[in-house]
Amino acid sequence: MGRLFVLTLEGKIYSCKHCGTHLALSENIVSKSFHCKHGKAYLFSKVVNVTSGEIENRMMMTGMHTVADIFCVCCGSIVGWKYETAHEKSQKYKEGKSVLERFKITGPDGSHYWASHDTHVAGSDADDV
């Protein structure tokens, strides 16, 4: 393994809730209308300091997508997923973008999001942008 380089962001930052590693800037949020099994999730145009898992096809609320889970590069915690391919034409805007689960990250103001006990969403994503 090589040397680990971790980028430090400036501005309104979303970080890994386990180790504090910077993951994304609020200015890169595309949508706050996404959902995961733990509650809310945000779609970002750019995330940093993550590694990708294996690419797989998943049936989500908006159809079939090819995705890869993403993990914090420092502590290895799963923090969301990245869209590789959207199989529906209307969902192509998601390609190359990443979703961070609010339950797994700390907000710019230091806020934590707790898992919603009412939420049960199979195949996590949303239609509205």
From Swiss-Prot:
In terms of InterPro entries, this protein maps to: Yippee (IPR034751), Yippee/Mis18/Cereblon (IPR004910), Yippee_fam (IPR039058)
Spell out the family assignment given in the record's similarity comment.
Belongs to the yippee family.
Q: Which UniProt keywords apply?
A: Metal-binding, Zinc
Q: Which residues form the Yippee domain?
A: 12-109
A cellular component term from Gene Ontology for this protein is: ubiquitin ligase complex
Q: What is this protein called in UniProt?
A: Protein yippee-like
Q: Which residues bind Zn(2+)?
A: C16, C19, C72, C75
One Gene Ontology molecular-function label:
metal ion binding
Q: Which residues form a coiled coil?
A: none
PANTHER family named in the record? PROTEIN YIPPEE-LIKE CG15309-RELATED (PTHR13848)
